[in-house]
Amino acid sequence: MECNQNYYQILDVDNTATKQQITQSYKKLVRKYHPDRNKNPEAIEKFKLIQSSYEVLSDDLKRLNYDSYLTACSNNNNFDVNNNFDVNNNFDVNNDLFNYYFIMKELFDKYDLNEEEQQEILDIFNIEFYQNNINTIGIDKANEILINKLIEYIPKITIKRISGQNKYLGSVVEFFFSFIT
């Protein structure tokens, strides 16, 4: 797979598309490019691309791997796609990036973070810092540092949310939190 080949574009959906939107677009495109309905010689290749795109984007884990691959592709010009992305092997994405993005994705999903909160976390937990740690102290220690930073940061998100939802309850939580930090 080439870095310039984008499954989201092939299926004509945004990278935030729901499974339902992906399936709807897939069905529409399959009808349009199916070799039995479309006699254009290029339709067969387009049909195959649509099939493989849907196979990846309709499976949560394959999609997560693919999203990590896209990010790595756009952030790293030396990223070797052939060695780092295989949709059939869940953990064969560039391991450094996969660990980082998997941890971040899990955090974003678990706490249902909005875009602003996600960006704040990505700014704090910088990928270059993470990769430097991997190179200097190893992946296990780098993951431990990343997870410890996340554990330290999560209560701040919680307090911010509670404070925003209820000013009285937020004050009480902030007061108690001041004793444990």
Curated annotation (Swiss-Prot):
Residue ranges annotated for the J domain, each copy included: 6-70
PROSITE patterns xref list: DNAJ_1 (PS00636), DNAJ_2 (PS50076)
Pfam families, alphabetized: DnaJ
Keywords assigned by UniProt, alphabetized: Chaperone
SMART domains (UniProt xref): DnaJ
Residues in coiled coil: none
Gene3D superfamilies, per database record: DnaJ domain (1.10.287.110)
Domain of life: Viruses
InterPro entries listed in its UniProt record: Apopto_cytoskel_mod (IPR051938), DnaJ_domain (IPR001623), DnaJ_domain_CS (IPR018253), J_dom_sf (IPR036869)
Cross-referenced PANTHER family: DNAJ HOMOLOG SUBFAMILY A MEMBER 3, MITOCHONDRIAL
Official protein name in the record: Putative J domain-containing protein R266
Species of the source: Acanthamoeba polyphaga mimivirus (APMV)
Organismal lineage: Viruses, Varidnaviria, Bamfordvirae, Nucleocytoviricota, Megaviricetes
